[in-house]
From Swiss-Prot:
Main location: nucleus
GO terms classed as biological process: generation of catalytic spliceosome for first transesterification step; mRNA splicing, via spliceosome
Family affiliation: Belongs to the crooked-neck family.
Name by which UniProt lists this protein: Pre-mRNA-splicing factor SYF1
Gene Ontology cellular component list: post-mRNA release spliceosomal complex; Prp19 complex; U2-type catalytic step 2 spliceosome
Function: Involved in pre-mRNA splicing and cell cycle progression.
Key words, A-Z: mRNA processing, mRNA splicing, Nucleus, Repeat, Spliceosome
High-level lineage: Eukaryota, Fungi, Dikarya, Ascomycota, Saccharomycotina
Record keyword Glycoprotein present: no
HAT repeats: 1-27, 30-62, 74-106, 130-161, 246-281, 339-373, 377-409, 428-460, 462-494, 496-529, 531-563, 598-632, 634-667
PANTHER family: PRE-MRNA SPLICING FACTOR, PRE-MRNA-SPLICING FACTOR SYF1
SUPFAM superfamilies on file: TPR-like
Subcellular location(s) per record: Nucleus
Subunit-level organization: Associated with the spliceosome.
C-alpha cells in the first residue's frame, strides 16, 4: 500500500491527503480513467469538499476540450451529470454554477441552459445574481429569440442602467414592440431626453404594426409637448405611422393639425412638404387605377398648394401677432376686395396700439388708401385712425399728414388745411411733447413736423397774414427750429417786412448756438443791401466776436467795406482774418485783394506777415510766390534773398521750390550766386536729414526696436562697412 493510501486511511476526514494524492498523479503516466476513479473516491469520501469537486470538475471539463459537442454528446452529458451531482451539496457555490453554465454554453442545449440559469438564480443569494446574469446575457445574445428577451428583462432588474443597451439589442433582434416599451420606461424615468425620443419615434416609424400602451398617437403627442422645437418632424412621424397602418383620414387630420398649429416656418415647411407628398402619392395611385376619386383628390391637392402662402402667414402671425409688417404681408396676399377689407379689419382689431410692433399708423393709412376712389369711406377711416391711442405722437402726425395730403391731391385744399388746423388746436398749450403719460392726441399740437407742413400748406393756399400768424404761433409754442427761422425770414423778406425779418434772424441766433454761424451768414447777406454801414459794422463785429475763426465772415465784411469804397478798412478786416485764421488760403485771398486795389508792390508787408505766421509747408509756398512776385517787379536781389530765406522752410525733396530757384539763378545769377544756392540747398538737406534721423530714433526707442549695444569683438568681419571719406562741406560741384 502506498504512502498516500496510508495517509488517507489514517486521516479519513482530512482533505489534504486527497489533494496531495491527486497532485501526485496529475503529471505521471496514470490513465485518465484511473484519475477519474481517484477523483470519484475522493468526492465520495468527502462529498462537501469544494476543493475536491473543483479539481474533479476542472479535470473532467478539460477532457472535453476540442471535442465536438454533437458528435461526443455522451461525454458532455456525463460531465453535465457530474456538475448536477456536485451542486446537490454545493448549490451555494457561485463558481460551480458559473463554470457549469459556461460548459453548457458550449453545447446545443438552450432549454437545459435556461433551466440551469433559473436554478442558479434560485439557489444563490441575490448578491451573486449579477455574476450569473452577465453570463446569462452572453448566452441570450448568442441564441437570440425570446430567450434573449427574457434574459434581458431579468438582467436589467439587476442593472437598470443597461436598459438603453437592452433597447438597442432588442431592436437589432427585431423585437420592436419590446424595445419601444423599454424606451418608454426610460423616457418616463429620464424626462426630456431628446435622443431617446428620436430613437423611439424612429422605431415607431420603421414598424408597420405596433401596439403600445399608451397608444402610439398619445406617445408622439406627448413628445410634441415635451419638444416643441421638434414639432414638425414628430408630426410627420405620427402621420406616416397612421399611413402605414392604413388610417389615411387620421393621417390627414394629423397633417392638417400640423400645418395649422405650427409655430415656426421650419416646422410648417417640414409638415407641409410631407403632406403635399402624401397627397401626390394618393393622386398618382388613383390615376394609375383610373379611380373616379382622382379628380376630387387633384382639386384638394391644388387647394392645399394655394393655401400655402396663407398658412405661412398664419405661422408668422402666431409668433408675432402684433407685427404690423406681418399683417401688411398678410393683407397683400388677398386679391378679392372683400377679403382685403376683412383682413384690414382683423388686423386693426388684433393689434393693441400699446403693443404694436412697428408703426400701427401705416396700417390705417394703407387701409384708407385702399379706398382712394371712395373719398367718403377713406375720410371715415382716416378719422377713425386719428382716434387710435398710438405709442408715439409721430404716428398720429403721420395719419394727419396722410389725410391732409389725400385731400390736397383731390383738390380739397380747404379740408386739407382744416384737418391740420384742427389737429394743432389744443386748449392746453403748456404740455410737454415728450410726456409719455399723456396720449398722442393731447400732445399732437406740439409736433414740429405737423406745424412745418401746416406752414407750407397755409403759405401755398392762404394769405401772407395767415402764414405769418402760423409762424408766430410756432414761436409762441417754443417750437422754433433753424429751418423755421430761415423759412419765416424768407417769407418776411418776400413781403418786404425787412425789420421783422432781421428780428427773426436775431431770435434764431440767440436760440440756436449750433446753427448760429449759418444763420449769421444769411442774416448778414440779407442785411448788407438794406442797412446802414455803422449798423452793419456792429453786426459783423458781433458775429466775428462769436466766430473769430470763420473765414467767410471776414470775407463778407471786407467785401462790404470795398463795396462802400472803404478799401483800407477792408484791408484791415483781411489782416484781422489772417491773424485769426492762419492758412495759406486766407493770406492768398488777402494778397489777391491787395494786388487788385494797390498793386503788386503793396503786397510785401502781407507776404512778410505770412512768412512769419504760417507753418513751414505753407510758408514755403508763399515764399515761392513772394520771390516770383519780386522777380516780376525786376527786384532780382530781393527775389534772391527771399529764395534764400524761404529755403529754411523748404525740404529739398520738394522739387518745385528748388527747381524754381535753379531756373532763377540760371536766368539771373552768376557762378557765385549759383554756388551759394547749392551750398544753401546742401545745408538745408543736412538739416532736414538730421531732423528726420532724430524723429525716427525717438520713434524706435519708444517702440523698443532700437538694437542694444554690441561689443566690437562680436561684430563679424563680413558685416563691417568700408569707411566713408570725410566730405568738404564747402566744396561745390557745378553742374551747369
Amino acid at each position: 500500500m502506498s504512502q498516500h493510501e496510508l495517509d488517507i486511511a489514517s486521516s479519513p476526514g482530512d482533505v489534504r491527503p486527497w489533494i496531495r494524492y491527486i497532485s501526485s498523479v496529475k503529471n505521471d503516466k496514470t490513465t485518465a480513467r484511473q484519475k477519474c476513479i481517484l477523483f470519484e473516491r475522493a468526492v465520495t469520501a468527502l462529498p462537501r469538499s469544494y476543493k475536491l469537486w473543483k479539481e474533479y470538475l476542472d479535470f473532467r471539463s478539460g477532457l472535453c476540450t476540442g471535442l465536438n459537442p454533437i458528435k461526443h454528446a455522451d461525454e458532455y452529458d456525463r460531465v453535465n451529470a457530474l456538475y448536477e451531482k456536485s451542486l446537490v451539496l454545493l448549490h451555494k457555490m457561485p463558481v460551480i454554477w458559473l463554470q457549469y453554465l459556461q460548459f453548457l454554453m458550449l453545447q446545443p442545449k438552450v432549454t437545459k441552459t435556461r433551466s440551469v440559469i433559473n436554478e442558479a438564480l434560485r439557489s444563490l443569494p441575490v448578491q451573486q445574481h449579477p455574476r450569473v446574469l452577465k453570463l446569462a446575457l452572453q448566452f441570450g445574445t448568442k441564441v437570440g429569440g425570446p430567450t434573449s428577451v427574457q434574459i434581458w428583462k431579468r438582467y436589467v432588474l439587476a442593472y437598470p442602467d443597461q436598459k438603453e443597451t437592452m433597447a438597442q439589442s432588442l431592436i437589432k433582434m427585431g423585437y420592436h414592440g419590446e424595445a419601444a416599451v423599454v424606451l418608454i420606461e426610460l423616457l418616463n424615468a429620464s424626462g426630456d431626453n431628446y435622443a431617446l425620443w428620436t430613437e423611439l419615434v424612429d422605431l415607431i416609424g420603421e414598424s408597420d404594426k405596433l401596439t403600445l400602451e399608451p397608444p402610439v398617437e398619445q406617445i408622439i403627442s406627448s413628445g410634441i409637448k415635451r419638444f416643441p422645437d421638434q414639432r414638425g418632424p414628430l408630426t410627420v412621424q405620427l402621420a406616416n405611422f397612421l399611413v402605414r397602418n392604413g388610417d389615411l383620414e387620421s393621417a390627414r387630420d394629423v397633417f392638417e393639425d400640423g400645418i395649422t398649429t405650427a409655430n415656426t416656418v421650419r416646422d410648417f415647411t417640414v409638415v407641409f412638404d410631407a403632406y403635399a407628398e402624401f397627397e401626390e402619392r394618393i393622386v398618382t395611385h388613383l390615376i394609375e387605377n383610373e379611380s373616379p376619386m382622382a379628380d376630387l383628390r387633384i382639386a384638394k391637392l391644388d387647394h392645399l398648394l394655394e393655401r400655402r402662402p396663407f398658412l405661412i402667414s398664419d405661422v408668422r402671425l402666431r409668433r408675432e401677432p402684433y407685427s404690423v409688417l406681418e399683417w401688411q404681408k398678410r393683407i397683400a396676399l388677398y386679391e378679392d376686395p372683400a377679403e382685403t377689407v376683412a383682413a384690414y379689419t382683423e388686423a386693426v382689431q388684433s393689434i393693441p396700439p400699446a403693443k404694436a410692433d412697428g408703426k400701427l399708423s401705416q396700417l390705417w393709412i394703407s387701409w384708407a388708401k385702399f379706398y382712394a376712389e371712395d373719398r367718403e369711406t377713406a375720410c371715415e377711416i382716416y378719422h377713425k385712425a386719428t382716434l387710435v391711442p398710438y405709442k408715439s405722437v409721430s404716428e398720429l402726425a403721420d395719419v394727419y399728414l396722410a389725410w391732409s395730403q389725400y385731400e390736397s391731391e383731390n383738390d380739397h385744399w380747404e379740408n386739407a388745411v382744416k384737418i391740420i388746423k384742427q389737429a394743432l388746436e389744443s386748449p392746453n398749450t403748456h404740455v410737454s411733447y415728450h410726456n409719455s403719460d399723456l396720449t398722442a392726441q393731447d400732445r399732437i399740437h406740439k409736433s414740429v413736423r405737423l406745424w412745418s407742413y401746416y406752414a407750407d400748406l397755409v403759405e401755398s393756399y392762404g394769405t401772407f397774414e395767415e402764414t405769418k400768424q402760423v409762424y408766430e404761433k410756432i414761436m409762441a409754442l417754443d417750437l422754433l427750429t433753424p429751418l423755421f427761422v430761415v423759412n419765416y425770414a424768407t417769407l418776411l423778406e418776400e413781403n418786404d417786412h425787412f425789420e421783422e425779418m432781421f428780428k427773426v434772424y436775431e431770435k434764431g441766433i440767440s436760440l440756436f448756438e449750433e446753427s448760429a454761424f449759418e444763420i449769421w451768414n444769411l442774416y448778414l447777406v440779407k442785411a448788407s443791401p438794406r442797412l446802414g454801414l455803422e449798423r452793419l459794422r456792429d453786426l459783423f463785429e458781433d458775429a466775428i466776436s462769436k466766430f473769430p475763426t470763420q473765414k467767410a465772415l471776414y470775407i463778407l465784411y471786407g467785401k462790404l467795406e470795398e463795396d462802400r469804397g472803404l478799401v483800407r478798412n477792408a484791408m484791415r478786416v483781411y489782416s484781422a482774418m489772417c491773424d485769426h485764421v492762419k492758412t495759406s488760403e486766407t493770406f492768398k485771398y488777402y494778397i489777391g485783394r491787395t494786388v487788385e486795389n494797390f498793386g503788386l508792390a503793396a503786397t510785401r508787408p502781407v507776404y512778410d506777415k505770412a512768412l512769419e505766421s504760417l507753418p513751414n509747408k505753407d510758408a514755403s509756398e508763399l515764399a515761392l510766390d513772394y520771390a516770383q512776385m519780386e522777380e516780376k517787379l525786376g527786384e532780382i536781389d530781393r527775389a534772391r534773398a527771399i529764395y534764400g530765406y524761404g529755403s529754411q522752410f523748404s525740404d529739398p525733396q520738394i522739387i518745385k521750390y528748388y527747381d524754381a530757384w535753379h531756373k532763377f539763378e540760371v536766368a539771373h545769377g552768376t557762378e557765385d550766386t549759383f554756388k551759394d544756392m547749392l551750398r544753401i540747398k546742401r545745408s538745408i538737406q543736412a538739416q532736414f536729414n538730421t531732423d528726420i534721423h532724430y524723429a525716427t530714433t525717438a520713434a524706435e526707442v519708444k517702440k523698443g526696436t532700437v538694437q542694444e549695444f554690441v561689443k566690437g569683438e562680436t561684430v563679424q568681419k563680413g558685416n563691417i562697412e568700408p569707411p566713408v571719406a570725410q566730405a568738404n562741406e564747402d566744396e561745390i560741384e557745378l553742374d551747369i
